[in-house]
């Protein structure tokens, strides 16, 4: 039973009537462009075929009822006419409540909803299960009540909910790719303008995601420290964001900066340049150049931004040794664990799977999880 069938069946069973709509929003993997989004820079993610699915129907009153199928059918119920506050014990509820609260501030021309939520985006892996949930919930209200909101606005609404209601200082990329993803393409996103350019993926290339299963937490962690260091760097150059600083300007005065801040700034500036070049390499089908750029990105995250861990570096080394220059591999996501992403010819997938299975656990004591993904369509009805 797929997620659509599962949520529709559960909806009918619990609520006693059929759902009118089923909405999906995908998770994502970022191919290159890490920690550039909140610096107004460029990112190159693609949506993946793992998603949050919500079967839903409008109500004729002002109540929102939510069932979380993946949490033993836990229930949340709240009124649109009372102030929406955080839930004491159900963290998943706060993503739903936050999205609805911020939607009310944008356009409150909507009423109650019944919904059943389920998803298969791996949680805590850096594949944006939370953004997928936020975009799915926003799309539910937009579709059921014909709200005049486009994908970018639904994405921004989700980001606001996560920043202000949930309390995690994320950038815009995760929500934007979930809302705007295009099948068989990556998106080069300008995080300042929110402009997105579809970049076709070469034929016969697999997007492989390997979860290190080294546990990471983002909320309240090193992520916010990195963000502050980047803001310190932008202030030093008297610019609104690091996006506005050139590598030449940085190199001329790097020695005047705090050494740690200088490393963080160098990563962001070089990563922005790599990301723009990667989009054109991908479009030309130049997997060799893409691989070089991904390798440089990983080294920069490891040495300048200092967000990798030994388990992740081990995974990258195993994959790189297997594929050589036929594709690329790097850490993806916020850092401190999580996943690596590899772009490799489909016929090399079995060899990579085997090499990782034979070596990773032996070296780290942790068993990996291996996903082969397809670049997928963004949020909408399914």
From Swiss-Prot:
Substrate binds at residues 34-37, 223. GO terms for molecular function: ATP binding; galactokinase activity; magnesium ion binding. It comes from Salmonella heidelberg (strain SL476). Catalyzes the transfer of the gamma-phosphate of ATP to D-galactose to form alpha-D-galactose-1-phosphate (Gal-1-P). Pathway: Carbohydrate metabolism; galactose metabolism. It catalyses: alpha-D-galactose + ATP = alpha-D-galactose 1-phosphate + ADP + H(+). This is Galactokinase. GO terms for biological process: galactose metabolic process. The gene is galK. It holds the Pfam family GHMP_kinases_N.
